[in-house]
UniProtKB/Swiss-Prot annotation:
The lineage of its organism: Eukaryota, Metazoa, Ecdysozoa, Arthropoda, Hexapoda. The gene is Amyrel. This is Alpha-amylase-related protein. It comes from the Eukaryota. Ca(2+) binds at residues 118, 169, 178, 212. The modification Pyrrolidone carboxylic acid is found at residue 21. Monomer.
């Protein structure tokens, strides 16, 4: 009986811990993460204080923090080829990272680190040097900076069959040296690395290439981590938020369902589906059942995004900053519709898949610069600073915990819906105007459209909509309007 009771208790503890790993630990009503891709730590700290905190962003996903291989031309993907777990990269050193985490936490913006637990670097001819000066011999699987030796890796093999579980989880993803996460030594070094980041105040982790690691191994690693650091404003016994990169298009041998109980999972079907819809390949009317109705994961288990740093570089349905009108419309819908744990992208300009982040002649990453309206101008795209996007972050905060109601569509690609009695969104993706009296569900009054402008000193700088005593307002979105969206919420009432 004692053994049975003990087993039950252990199962309950594990289940509780797993559930806790779905909690992103946001402040107040904040509920949107931004990925500041390849930004320096000092610049992220300033952005938290000057923009993200005041605009109500909940958190930042940062690029990998540990030492990586130095590759010719400094492509972005060198950050995904570890040499050691020393906290020195082109984004800064450990002191600068710790300062950034502290400053962001102080203004209510949580930090989530992109971590590489699956592998080390790819092959390199001879001695490779990392961003902290560590040397390694990747061809011999020798990484003294950790240290790892060949005994800590799976035997080398290529992934040629993506339906072969052994290949997917024990062979080398694009030639990257594949760690053996069942090894006690490897586990200890990974846990030590993650625990150090927790000590510095991070709120959680985006786990790169999670599907290439056995779920049981990841479960052991996650459950062995320390609680979050209460000195950074986290409650006692808070567990790190985990969201895992698992690419699953619905026909994968290694599926998302193996990982969604361990933490949230990146819902790539969301990205593809929303891209298809706003590119005009699917009528927007079908988005009424968006989310689980489309076969997506349960809302609290899905990390959702229009694009990410990988798929924005691929040809296909996925939208990126190069299609700005459709991208802003898709992002507005993403942040208005009550599904998923939302992340928005903040990119740098690229002409090909390997383009490096903006850098100077010494190959040092440069800081973003801003024009008089706050937009980035020197190679950084900064979608999160586009008014149409940061305004929808505010919309999402204003309508948090409300339900979708009063869906309307024209049978094609003009849609609208309410979020409780706090918000209203209308979208026009047709080649003709939307001009319609629509139920906004809002209290009577005049509301500023936060897409075309904002509420400043008691008046609207863009469009406005007058809502009558029955909740109806006249919405007009021209087919040739700069933006195909209209958004109203209670915090933008005149």
């Amino acid at each position: 009986m004692f053994k049975f009771a003990t087993a039950v208790i252990l199962c309950l503890v594990a289940a509780s811990s797993t559930l806790a790993q779905h909690n992103p630990h946001w402040w107040g009503n904040r509920n949107t993460i931004v990925h500041l891709f390849e930004w320096k730590w000092s610049d992220i700290a300033a952005e938290c204080e000057n923009f993200l905190g005041p605009r109500g962003f909940a958190g930042v996903q940062v690029s990998p923090v540990n030492e990586n291989i130095v590759s010719a031309g400094r492509p972005w993907w060198e950050r995904y080829q570890p040499i050691s777990y020393k906290l020195t990269t082109r984004s800064g050193n450990e002191k600068e990272f710790a300062d950034m985490v502290r400053r962001c936490n102080e203004v209510g913006v949580r930090i989530y680190v992109d971590v590489l637990l699956n592998h080390m670097s790819g092959d390199f001819d001879g001695i490779a040097v990392g961003t902290a000066g560590s040397e390694a011999e990747p061809s011999k699987k020798s990484y003294p900076g950790v240290p790892y030796s060949a005994l800590d890796f799976h035997p080398s093999c290529e992934i040629t069959d993506w339906n072969d579980r052994f290949q997917v989880q024990q062979c080398e993803l694009v030639g990257l040296k594949d760690l053996d996460q069942s090894s006690e030594w490897v586990r200890s070094k990974l846990i030590e690395f993650l625990d150090h980041l927790i000590e510095l105040g991070v709120a959680g982790f985006r786990v790169d290439a999670a599907k290439h690691m056995a779920a049981d191994d990841l479960s052991f690693i996650y459950s062995s981590l320390s609680d979050l650091n209460i000195e950074h404003g986290f409650p006692h016994n808070a567990r790190p938020f985990i969201f895992q990169e698992v690419i699953d298009h619905g026909h994968e041998t290694v599926s998302r369902e193996e990982y969604n109980q361990l933490g949230a999972v990146t819902e790539f079907r969301f990205s593809e589906g929303i891209g298809n819809a706003f590119r005009g390949n699917n009528a927007l009317k079908w988005l009424q059942s968006w989310g689980t109705g489309w076969g997506f994961l349960p809302s609290g288990q899905a990390l959702t995004f229009v694009d990410n740093h990988d798929n924005q570089r691929d040809m296909g349905a996925v939208l990126n900053y190069k299609s700005p009108k459709q991208y802003k419309m898709a992002t507005a819908f993403h942040l208005a519709y009550p599904y998923g744990i939302s992340r928005v992208m903040s990119s740098f300009a690229f002409d090909d898949h390997d383009t490096a982040p903006p850098q100077d002649e010494q190959e040092k990453i440069i800081s973003p610069e801003f024009d008089e309206e706050g937009a980035c101008v020197n190679g950084w795209i900064c979608e999160h600073r586009w008014r149409q996007i940061y305004a929808m972050v505010g919309f999402k905060n204003a309508v948090r915990d409300t339900e979708l109601s009063n869906w309307w569509d024209n049978g094609d690609s003009q849609i609208s819906f309410c979020r409780g009695n706090k918000g209203f969104l209308a979208v026009n993706n047709n080649l003709y105007d939307l001009s319609q009296e629509l139920q906004t569900c809002l209290p009577a009054g005049v509301y500023c459209d936060v897409i075309s402008g904002s509420l400043v000193d008691g008046s609207c700088t863009g469009k406005s909509v007058t809502v009558d005593d029955n909740g109806y307002g006249y919405a007009h979105i021209g087919s040739d309007d700069f933006d195909g969206v209209l958004a109203l919420h209670v915090d933008a009432k005149v």
